[in-house]
Amino acid sequence: MSNIAFYVVSDVHGYIFLTDFTSRNQYQPMGLLLANHVIEQDRRQYDQSFKIDNGDFLQGSPFCNYLIAHSGSSQPLVDFYNRMAFDFGTLGNHEFNYGLPYLKDTLRRLNYPVLCANIYENDSTLTDNGVQYFQVGDQTVGVIGLTTQFIPH
């Protein structure tokens, strides 16, 4: 039997660094870069590990607000996420705050699959797939991406 670990990053809300850039000498206890560093240090001890973004990454920080207000593109944020080498992600309710066109553009730019089995647009799922299967040794691992019921179908 393989030794498997799941690392889940959730509710980052665009906090990449240990600051929100709103004042000097103000620090957050965690950000995406620090979380990724901790994960990468720990995952070495496992035969197989999966790094997952559990959603709510696209909205919430001054950085995200700046991107939507001044460039209309999430590309700088996506660049950070793509470098983190996530195996897959899911959608949180805040991914929809800037509108569906912005979200769809962001999803096209990500270099990992985003799983969401329960959000629909015009009778089809919003993402390409809601389920992903992985073969780990002699085991098949299935992962389902689901989003809170507060998002309309």
Language-model regions, residue ranges each:
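Acidic, metal/ion-coordinating pockets
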Residues: M1-H153
